[in-house]
Regions:
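N-terminal secretory signal peptides that target proteins for export/translocation
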Residues: 1-7
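Bacterial N-terminal signal peptides
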Residues: 12-21
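A structural "domain/chain start" motif
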Residues: 24-98, 206-218
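Surface-exposed short loop/turn segments
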Residues: 25-39, 108, 115-167
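Generic short beta-strand segments
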Residues: 62-67, 132-138, 175
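Short acidic, glycine/proline-rich loop/turn micro-motifs
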Residues: 72-74, 140-144, 181-186
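Short secondary-structure boundary motifs at beta->alpha junctions and helix caps
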Residues: 80-92, 160-214
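Amphipathic alpha-helical segments
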Residues: 96-109
Length: 218
């Protein structure tokens, strides 16, 4: 579980504070949210791939979204009651989660590729990764000048081996928060949601190992 505390910015004029408080979004507003943050030097460096290591070929297919509201991934609320929904920018949390998983695996040296559908067994990948989204949300609560951000994820990840048709399944849940953010930007929400989402991927990788062309639990 991630627990972070950050303070951004400094003292601001009272007039600016009043503008921030009065500029509350209405309940009908929607902000698009990327599960893999776009832009920024820090983000660009984090998605750098490494040379693939020898091992099985892995395909990641879109996750099943088991949430009641599949478009929504949280909200921003103000101290005056205004609310803005965060929606998945592409419209599919399952696809973006799978693509984020592929990015993570490539950074770890896996021979991983995203596939829109499950590949055919013949001449296909050695391992197919899929999953289910049980929880995926980031909520930003604005107080007087400062905003607290909390992200929560719960994923089921399944790996199916082509060689013997065996499979393994793991479920993980993680949360994290950034408190007292002075000037909230949607990228702040994207960043922490991405961090928490990757904790699920990290746990899966840490608790599995390759055995020839298959994947097993450690």
């Amino acid at each position: 579980m991630i627990r972070q505390h950050v303070v951004r910015g400094g003292t601001a004029p009272v007039a600016l504070g009043l503008l921030l408080l009065l500029g509350c979004s209405g309940k009908s507003d929607i902000i698009p949210m990327n599960l893999v943050p776009k832009g920024g030097k820090e983000v660009a460096g984090s998605v750098q791939t490494v040379k693939p290591m020898p091992g099985p070929r892995v395909a990641v297919i879109p996750f099943e979204d088991a949430r009641a509201d599949r478009a929504r991934v949280g909200s921003r609320t103000s101290m005056w009651g205004g609310e803005t929904d965060f929606n998945v920018s592409s419209g599919s949390a399952g696809e973006e989660t799978a693509q984020a998983f592929v990015d993570y695996l490539k950074r770890k040296g896996w021979q991983a590729q995203y596939s829109k559908v499950a590949p055919a067994a013949e001449n296909g990948p050695d391992i197919v990764l899929s999953g289910k989204i049980l929880e995926l949300a980031v909520d930003a609560k604005r107080g007087f000048l400062l905003t607290d951000i909390e992200a929560r994820t719960k994923l089921v990840i399944q790996a199916k081996n082509r060689e013997d048709e065996s499979s393994i399944v793991r479920t993980d849940a993680h949360s994290g928060n950034h408190d007292n953010v002075f000037w909230f930007d949607p990228q702040d929400g994207e960043g922490i949601l991405s961090e928490v989402l990757e904790k699920n991927f990290e746990r899966f990788v840490m608790n599995t190992r390759f055995e020839d062309r298959s994947i097993r639990f450690r």
